[in-house]
Amino acid sequence: MFTMQALTKTTAIGLATLMLAACATSPTGRSQFLLVSPQSAIVESEAAYLSTVKALDEDNKLVKDPALMARVARITGRLVSVAHQDFPTSKNWKWSVAIIDDADTVNAWCMAGGRMAVYTGLFEKLRLTDDEFAQIMGHEISHALANHTAERMSRAMATMVGVMAVGAASDNNSVAVTGAAIGAKLALELPNSRTAESEADQIGISLATKAGYDPEAAVTLWQKMGDLNDKRPPEFLSTHPAPNNRQAALNKMVRPMRAINPTQRKAPITEITIVQ
């Protein structure tokens, strides 16, 4: 039988082993802490996405407007085409997007594995151009391509293991047991780090530019976000904290991005699933 001291020692050894195995590198060369593998993040994200979409469908919250569906499919399809070129493993992803009927919510996201969602509030509150919408979705897709979902899940797991270790050390089984629930909750609610946001800005503006959209729109998009934030902070900013000097950093990227695709030649459109 394990004693509590032995359990604590085992937990510490296990945590140390996990830490050593958790080293990874992002597409920009940044070191990443990944206790959760990218493939595990894809599997968990798919399950969460299907559950979310099912609930939305039951509540009649999935948009079926042909014009909006075509617009979203066209723009995201071009971004996915570029993603396939720059990140070949993403060719195996089940790319799909749900358009959620919620005029008050200004948000969008992309889970590991290419499972996306966009809220109608983005269009109604921000009056987005195609170029600006491409920047938002390029940013979101970049979070998935750069394994930011796995990073958030890893942070949640580290918190969970820490809580369980404290519970074991203090002979408090209830603390150890509830650690798992805390970890699962954090995986869903933790915002991206500001470092991850800067990385998604960098990768996202490149994706959108290569797809044929104006890189200047990255700047005008965040100006609109800033104006809206003065009235009421959009949900987008609660999970996407703004890095310091975001607009200035994006401004510096515009000229080199224009050199990549000076004629804004449109990328081919990869067919993706619009969830209905």
Locations of the language-model features?
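A Zn2+-metalloprotease active-site environment signal
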Residues: F2, L7-T11, C23-Q276
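C-terminal motif of bacterial Sec signal peptides marking the signal peptidase cleavage site
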Residues: L18-A22
